[in-house]
From Swiss-Prot:
This is Ribosomal RNA large subunit methyltransferase G. It is found in: Cytoplasm. InterPro entries: DNA_methylase_N6_adenine_CS (IPR002052), rRNA_m2G-MeTrfase_RlmG (IPR017237), RsmC/RlmG (IPR046977), SAM-dependent_MTases_sf (IPR029063), Small_mtfrase_dom (IPR007848). Transmembrane segments: none annotated. GO terms for cellular component: cytoplasm. The keyword Thylakoid does not apply. GO terms for molecular function: 23S rRNA (guanine(1835)-N(2))-methyltransferase activity; nucleic acid binding. SUPFAM superfamilies: S-adenosyl-L-methionine-dependent methyltransferases (SSF53335).
């Protein structure tokens, strides 16, 4: 938890999930402050759009202007809602949209936190292109190291004339004026053939490893369980390739695809629809913070390729929460399978949570682990 006085209001903000007290991470950064310094209450007229507000620092500061918070992270929405409540600001002050929704027309101000992936930024800029006007003030911010020539060129290509500021506290801003430059259409998804199958895998803009199968998933797919029954979870499903393979290998089972990214869940649904439409009645698709709100003792197996970063920060907090949720929601003798980089040492973390852990396979970079829920002990 950290305090910030940004010129609009004094706030106490925390990350979601919360980090430990030993290695605390802030819920705001210099780029948030820098963006807010550019604004004056009197100049905000028309809809205010805020894109990729990771923990709600901008939305909370500007809540009196009833901003739209737009992004591809359910965790960010939960963080913003929690920080609004914590600062006694009505949750209804902020309207939440995911990146696939239509944006409000003719915004007066657009604030963008530059996302990690250029593909998501392009998708969002193309969506903005449909609604902004030459009078819309468009400002983007990020750590200086995360603003590249390619970032500026993308703003120029999609929206119009673009300039950048000097660095301040290692943050920089991008100012852009809409001039509607000529722009070729772009496909909504990027697609590729999955080796060894006749499947075409479709990927929306913010899906991890959207240009091809990542090497961790490739290794995991070589060691997926077969002959499972009941409900299986593809937790952190991404484009759904693991869940799709589970559907094929386990015809007696159903698969729940879960991710905090609406684009990931949309990609998973699309990939089942196009590659195994006959299996749709064995599928459920869920945008969620891991397995929050899901009843305990429900699933026979959970499979997970957990992230070890949140936005630009390295952290195992998301993975740790996934493991705890998996244990709670597994039936007795239910199994958790994960693939992870070897250096993360998840073996001992799983053993601490489940009381057991087995190495299924390993190579020079990755390890596949299995933990079994043996009883009600934590």
């Amino acid at each position: 938890m950290s305090h910030v006085d940004n010129g609009f209001r004094s706030l106490t903000l925390k990350r979601f999930p919360e980090t430990d007290d030993v290695n605390p991470l802030q819920a705001w950064e210099a780029a948030d402050e820098y963006l807010l310094q550019q604004l004056d209450d009197t100049e905000i007229s028309g809809p205010l759009l805020i894109l990729n507000d990771a923990f709600g620092a901008l939305s909370c500061a500007l809540a009196e202007h009833t901003p739209y918070s737009i992004g591809d992270s359910y965790l960010s929405e939960l963080a913003t809602r929690e920080n609004l409540r914590h600062n006694d600001i009505a949750e209804s002050s902020v309207k939440f949209l995911d990146s696939t929704a239509a944006y409000p027309p003719a915004p007066g101000v657009v604030l963008i936190k530059v996302p990690k992936t250029l593909a998501l930024l392009e998708q969002q800029l193309r969506a903005l292109r449909q609604v902004v006007t030459p009078q819309t003030r468009i400002i983007a911010g990020a750590k200086a190291r995360d603003i590249h020539t390619s970032t500026l060129e993308l703003f120029e290509k999609v929206l119009g004339p673009t300039t950048t500021t000097l660095a301040w506290k290692k943050a920089r801003l991008i100012n852009c004026t809409f001039s509607k430059p000529e722009l070729a259409d772009a496909p909504q998804t990027l697609s590729w053939k999955l080796d060894g199958t006749d499947w075409t895998i479709h990927n929306h803009a913010n899906v991890f490893s959207r240009t091809g199968l990542d090497i961790g998933a490739r290794f995991f797919m070589q060691h997926l369980p077969e002959n499972l029954e009941g409900e299986i979870v593809d937790l952190g499903c991404g484009n759904g390739v693991i869940g799709l393979t589970l559907l094929a290998k386990n015809p007696q089972a159903s698969v729940v695809f879960v991710d905090e990214s609406p684009m990931a869940v949309a990609s998973s649904r699309l990939n089942v629809e196009t590659n195994m439409p006959e299996a749709l009645d064995r599928c459920e698709f869920m945008i969620n913070n891991a397995l929050s709100g899901v009843e305990p003792f429900r699933f026979n197996a959970v499979l997970c390729n957990p992230p070890f970063h949140q936005k630009h920060a390295l952290t195992d907090n998301v993975a740790w929460e996934m493991f705890h949720h998996a244990r709670r929601c597994l039936k007795i003798n239910g199994e958790l399978y994960i693939v992870a980089n070897r250096h993360l040492d998840y073996f001992h973390k799983l053993k601490k949570i489940f009381g057991n852990c087995t190495t299924i396979a390993t190579n020079n970079k990755f390890v596949v682990l299995k933990a079994v829920k043996t009883g009600r002990r934590r």
